[in-house]
Structures are given as C-alpha cells and as structure tokens.
C-alpha cells in the first residue's frame, strides 16, 4: 500500500465531505466522511507519519453519526424530468458516436449521430422549456454537422474515393477464443494466454469448443465467451434499454414488500457508476447472497489498498481511461468468469424497490452510486434470479475475479488445520496482496447466534489481519452492514481493550458503540472456534505459466463409484521441470454448472487425485498409493497443490474422480506453475475394442486356482491375434466379488522372443475389477479364464479387449 497516495485520498474525501456538509447534501457528506476515515486507517497501516491521525478518524466518524438524523429529516432533491433524461441520453449517443468516429468506424458513428439528432429534435418539440430547447438544438446541430461530414466520402463515386479515406467495416465475426480477460494482476509476459489454452498453447480442440458452447447456456440463457468484439458492444440508444429476458425472479422475502421496478434516475437526480470503490459502502439487503456481497467487499478493499482494477474493470461501458461510467440509456455489460472462461452478461438498470422506495437489492451507502447493485444484478441473472439459493465465496470470488479458489475447513475430520501455520500464512500473504479472504460460520442455534452476535452459515469479508504483542486479530465485515461480534474484543468489551491496543488497531470502542456498520475485530482464536471455513482466492499472477483443458466426463463411462476402478476416469499427464530451490504447481478442477437446481442441491462430489506414475494411466485407486489423495466435496471448484523440492523432471498422473457419478459433467482443469511444464490428456493407444458378455452360473462359478476341482469349470475364451502388438484386457464383475483372470498361451506364430510367456495373470484378485496390460503380446492363440476368488459366486461379467490389431474371440467353455 502507498501511504502517500492514501493520505491524498483522505484529504480529497475530507474536502468533499466538508463541502457537501456545508451545502446541506448530507447523504453525500456521510459517504465522504466514511471514506476519509477509511483512507486514514489504511494510510496508518501503510506507515503514515501524519500527526493526530487517530483523532481525525474519530472526528470524521463522529460527524457521520451526527449527520444521520439530518439525512433522515432532509427531503431529497427533485428528480430530473423525462425531457432532461432524454437530453442525457442524446449526450451519451453523441459521446459514443465520437468514440466510433475516432476509431474510424464510420457507419456506426453516422448511425449514432443520426439517432442523437432525431432524439434531440423530438424532445425539443415536446418540451416548453426554452433553455432545454436551446441545449437540444445545439447538440442536434453538432451531431448533424459531423454526420454529414462523415457521409460525404461515402457518397463520392467509387473511382474518386481515396484508398485511405474510408476503411471497410470488418464483419462482426465471433472467434472461438475468449478475450484474455486478465484476472492476473501484473501477469508476466510468459503467461500462456487463455486464448490458446490447451496443453501446447494451441487453439481449442473441437471437444473443447463443444464443451464451452454447451455450458454457455445457464438457466436457459446463453452467456457467450467474452471476446475482443465485445469491447465494441453498443450501449447508446434513444430509448431506455430493456433486457430482452425480462425482469429477474424475486426472492420470497422481496415479494412480500415489493412495489415496482425503477431505474436509477427514479431514485436520485445524480446517478453515477462509482464515486469511489470502498468496502465500507456496500450493504446487503434481503437477497440471500451474503457470500457474494462479502466477495464484493473484499474485492473493493483490495482495489482500494493496492490500486488495481480488480472489480471496476469488469463493468462496461467504460470511458477512455478504462473507468466504468453511468449510462443514461440503461444498458450495462459485466464480465464474469463462468464455466471455464470469462463470459459476457448483459443487463438493464431496472432495480426492485419496496413501497417506501427503498431498494430490495444490495446497494452502496451512497445512494447515487450504482456499481454494487448492477454487479449483483448481473450475477443474480446468471444464477437464475434474486431467489438465489446461496453460494460460498470460493464460487463468487472466482466469478468476479477469476482468482484461484481454495477452501480451508477448520473443523474437518478429513482435513488437518494448524492454527499457527495458517495465521502466519494468511498474515504474510494478505499484506502482500496475494490473496482475498472471507470467513464463514457454520450451523449454530438461534441462542448461540444471539449470544455471540453471529449469523449461522453466513459469510464475512476479511478486511484486515493484525498481530500485536502475541495477540492475533482479524477484522471482519458483516455484509448486512450491521450486527457485530459480541465476544472478546467487541465494542462492548471493557476488559480486554487497552489504550495501546486501541491505537494499534485504530479502534475506539466508544465511537464504535455509536455506529453499527457490521465491521468488528475478533481474535484469531475466537474465529477458529466460532467460524467454520476460511475461503481464499489467490492472485493467478503469482504463477508465471498456466494452461487449461476443457472436457466432458460422460455418465455412461465407467461405474457409478470409482472405488475399485479408475479405468474410465479422465486422466492427464503433467510433466514439470523443477528448478533449483523448488517450485509450486497448483491444479484447479472446476465443474461447469448450468442449472440453478444443480447449484442449490449440488450432489456432484468431485476431486483430483495425483499419482507418481510417470504420466501412465492408473487403473486401481490404491495401487500404487496416491501421491496426493483428494477429498471429495460438493463444490464446483477443487484445488490441488503440488510442492516440489527436488530439481529435475517430475511426471505425474492426474485423475479426475467423483464420489458417485450420477450425471454427465463438463469441467475445466487449469494448471498454474512457477516453472516450465507440459500438460495433456493421456490418450488411449488402442484403436480397436471388443466386449464379451459372460456370467458365472451354477457349475461355471468355479472360483480361483486354489479350488482345483471346480476351477476347471470356469468359462474359457480363446482369442487369436495375428500380429505382435499391445493388448489391454479388463474384467468387470459384481463389486461384492473379488475377480481375476489368467491368460494361457496355446500356440505362437514363430519364435515369440522375449515377449513370449506360458501363463500371465491379472495379479491379486480385486473387488469388481482387474486388468492385464501387455506392451507386446506375440501373434498366436491364447486362452483366457475369468473367475471369482471363491466358488459358487454367481453373476455377470464383462471382458474387454483393447488393441491396435484385429482379434478373433470364441468361447470354448
């Protein structure tokens, strides 16, 4: 953080606050006093040497409290008339026309100028306001003059047109490759662009294109990948824009108080996109999206602290400086990371209000500021409406930023948690700007929640992490902007707050008692005790290289459970060149979600399992034992961290796994690495396959070779292979039985050489599945005897033969 820049912010906000205060514009004054206080808090964190900084913070916050009653009593300024709004839309049309004009998009510019002229003339005839008429006519003349000047070259004979006078308008072709949305702050140039994110940095395969096309339709609406052509999206119209998909479905709580849909100009006479990005200003209402609002809050805090466009960069239209701007025509575009790529979400600016005219969606405490409500609306549209089933910050932050999600469970039997190591890691990474953090509570009784001031299963934004003389603290924000922690170090704790600690944490309990803004300090020990999960989102810019593969796992491929066989699981080869000093490689598995019910009742438990098998296919889950085993969770994102300490080449097999495979899933595997690597799907070397359906029944259920009297009664198949080549044989039987098979050479054509054998088996008998892979089986005739371990174990089985050479198979017995 830059202390000097934050001091400048504080001075600017304080000046604006005092100015608005004197003008009687109390709502705006409250907003700027809060921002000035927040800027000073961050400045002190960054090492500011300003004198009396704590006194100034207290002064601003006390003035906020004093102004609250004035805000309630003061009547709002009159709203703009329809004709004034038409003038604003005409100005915006001309502004957009100027932009197209500068880019030499002549036809688009002429169209926008012409529409501005028509709107100005129409409105000037409708209004009796002479001043407004003059403004409209002047704007119409300017637009008309420029439109005529641009039209002249288009009307000249073809032979007289200069080769440089008018550029042909390129066709609006959408390529298959999404715009490199750059969620990676300060990404090194060597980073492999998402435009070409298969294993070798080539273009998408046909399968990947089909995956991205299929998962573009979310809750019945198509959200196409965000591409370069979308930067030319049209935002200016003579009439207010209306989303062709209609109004968003409301939640049950919204419906009880809903009155109507309004546009920003119906709420304020001075709507703007962003006054300043601030976590203090965000307020959640009755939509059940606490994790999303918490995600917005920490993204805003990050943008403020590190001056990186983490959240404001995703809203369009934008001005020439890349700043999002208010559009009086009511159309906006938000770029969200969904189902493998950044995607384009179009919304209008209609928002729900109650009978008092209060917004029923999240909003900024500065009522003229729109960014909070509009980003929330875009996300709610994708999620199927304001009747949002709820989420977690891993999902929401990934959608907003594209950063890498990680989940730390503090009370899990399957995941170890170290309080000391975790705090040290969070403290260091948070202050470096490497990570965004939220914390969520688990289930608790109403009495427990009331006692501690906590909301069950609720997400809180982490705004700060501090350590003071062995004491460790986390600053949290409740997205509701009220209701705070009531335990140790709350504003009402008279025992633990010392003057020294108050100064270090910039916290005055007496001032905090006057204003409940939902922001509080909690000790690390108490957070670990009363909260359930910490959600992290890591800056991908920490890794200089990355690539991804989009794919599909068909529900028909393999058994429902992969507890005994991984033969049908998607598998990938990862080869890493580890330098001296070691390196980190992270692998993110993301399941694509296209339906609100799937999102609300996620029953797909996915994970990634890592094996050290030199990139060869793995068939048995525990043989060899996993290098890194996965925990199957019903979250769409699963992060695997591989830490390398030894220099050289390391080769892994990555296996996608599910607890119970019920449905076909589409997914993305994305690899992030601090060093060079290659990543590819493990291909099958076999081009031919045959399946034999058999069964053990009655006498033919003879058991293994230990039972000599009955083993000879097992089914026997004979296969004939004409040329030497690789062969894979797989046996699948009832999971409750241990199965195996034996291959016996009957005869070979010529000298079999080193590949010849008398007998080979599938090894130890295993539950439900076994296999034998021969790199080179000599040409000849062979018998295969499948069996269960014990006699009299009846049931069906499948024998699968996979090869590159035709095989003839007959049943002998």
From Swiss-Prot:
Q: What is this protein called?
A: Calpain-7
Top-level enzyme category: hydrolase
Q: Which Gene3D superfamilies match?
A: 2.60.120.380, Cysteine proteinases (3.90.70.10), Phosphotransferase system, lactose/cellobiose-type IIA subunit (1.20.58.80)
Q: Does the keyword Protease apply?
A: yes
- Function per UniProt: Calcium-regulated non-lysosomal thiol-protease.
Q: Where in the cell is it found?
A: Nucleus
N-acetylmethionine found at: 1
Database matches in InterPro entries: Calpain_cysteine_protease, Calpain_domain_III, Calpain_III, Calpain_III_sf, MIT_dom, MIT_dom_sf, PalB/RIM13_Calpain-like, Papain-like_cys_pep_sf
Q: Which GO terms describe its molecular function?
A: calcium-dependent cysteine-type endopeptidase activity; cysteine-type endopeptidase activity; endopeptidase activity; MIT domain binding
Does the entry feature the keyword Phosphoprotein, yes or no? yes
Give the UniProt entry's GO cellular component terms.
centrosome; cytosol; extracellular exosome; nucleus
Family, similarity comment? Belongs to the peptidase C2 family.
Q: Which EC number(s) does the record attach to this protein?
A: 3.4.22.-
Residues of the active site: 290, 458, 478
Which parts of this chain are annotated as the region Domain N?
702-813
PTM sites of type Phosphothreonine? 95
Upper lineage: Eukaryota, Metazoa, Chordata, Craniata, Vertebrata
CDD domains linked to this entry: CysPc (cd00044), MIT_calpain7_1 (cd02681)
Domain Calpain catalytic stretches: 232-540
Q: In which tissues is it expressed?
A: Ubiquitous.
